[in-house]
Amino acid sequence: VNFQEILKTATSERKLIRAIAYVIKSSNTEEESFFEALDKQGFEVKMKDLQIFMSGVKKADWDVGIAIDAIKMADKLDVVILVTGDGDFAPLITYLQENKGCLVEVIAFGKTTSSKLRELADDFCDLDGNPRYLMSQGKEKMHFFKKSTLKRK
């Protein structure tokens, strides 16, 4: 995924306040260059170690951290953009819209995005079938699908 292109399109003509990449660090040394690339592209990189339990189960969960950060920053933001298709973020979207007056946009691969997330988001951008947002550069534009407009109180 070409995160620089996603960031460029997501911010469009808006002022970027913060772009945070939530990453999981494993023992793979190759990921360091990926994390450095995200940093150079303007992302603040927040990192957690991959947890490996005695049973062999691996867990890497940023859901609560992402939700806390979004809620802490919401009073200073008009728009929150989530790049995820995970339906676990549906309550966060509702909270940001109803309690903080934020517009919430979701950018994700449509085929794997929760239908509830798509329904709740003020705008949804489907990355499926758009080569511009893959590492091979294409020339197509990302399209947001407008659903509704919320005004700040």
Regions found by a protein language model. Give the residues of each.
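Terminal and domain-boundary accessory regions
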Residues: V1-K153
